């Protein structure tokens, strides 16, 4: 919600629940609050950290619904929401991150080691062997969260500086979920060639780079060129983070409905960076490309249309023009587009036990209750924290980078991403809650760090991109110790 420009006209889109749900705490916990003075039992300082968490510690009234596919009317003013967010970010030390000194600096002797003259010694060693930077500096546990502010989620092209709170929020998640230090870097540059050069010039500082909120199609080339150019992991989370969590939920949904992955028909609404990365992942997992139909704002991607290189890879030789024309007997709907683009009539056309991933945020392509109204046997996932099966990038990116840094991986490759998919899916299946309303772990599942990271690190070594092989038992024990210091 905090990612969206706060306009009165958007109030309906921002509702969390309605009808019989009654009054609900906007942090999306199960509690129902009776009045504005009631306290939310799950309200926490982390609530306003980062929009990808999908929560907000502001009270909403959700008493009324306008029509069958509309959202809800709330009794909250935008002033209250804005004030809560601004107060959170301005309270105490400004912003959300700070630097912590890790060595004692209590004496003149300490100072002589921390800075001149002692600091020259590690400089000389690193000059002889650049790999020593991982031993003598913070590089090995430091990620750059880098944006140019051209596609800040829900806000669009707001520029580098205005995107800084989001990047700080991402840094918070790296630290709180995986113990990774992160610096946010906002670059005021929209030319892809110059952006690549700037990031490449900055890369000696970091052990890995997380690209964030760079608009398509430029984001594809920026990531590809940096991956080719640099010897540290470069990861565009908007693409691949979404794809990994979608992949995990997808595998479990197939298992619950008894489907053969090679036979499923997938219809996708959306052809942006996240959507196409998700489709690449599904094909990597076993979906047949010829069984995938993709729609953008102009309709079905067909061989007759003039398409970008990325979209052309998904073009079908068909006369169908609209989503409604291709969704008949589809097993899976994948939505990364906008609210209202999936209709109940479309769901009725799908195969029995349809799998509906309506991931547009904050308002999905079709609300879960409306999907279930016409298909009670459906499995539904959204990007929202107030519904079951939340597809959230934070389930993977902290652990991917933790594994990549610890194994000294030169890149985050497909084998590592696939290992993360499989580990997340297995973690959900191992839980007693596993079922149609629990196909992926929740964000605060304390098993994530130890249950996902070792498998990713092992995949990095087995696929030849890790410079360090980690002992599985010892590494798991180290992660368990780290986990106790985090959330």
Predicted regions and their residues:
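Rossmann-like adenosine-cofactor binding region
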Residues: 312-379, 384-386
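Adenosine-phosphate binding glycine-rich loop
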Residues: 237-238, 257-259, 358-470
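Active-site nucleophile and cofactor-binding loops and adjacent substrate-binding regions
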Residues: 188, 235-244, 267-271, 385-387, ...
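Residue-level detector of structural "landmarks"
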Residues: 26-28
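Short, Lys/Arg-enriched N-terminal segments with co-localized hydrophobic residues
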Residues: 49-77
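N-terminal ligand-binding/catalytic initiation module
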Residues: 78-234, 459, 463-467, 486-487
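Glycine-rich phosphate/diphosphate-binding loop of Rossmann-like nucleotide-binding domains
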Residues: 161-172, 244-330, 334
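Short glycine/serine/threonine-rich phosphate/pyrophosphate-binding segments
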Residues: 153-155, 219, 242-247, 269-280, ...
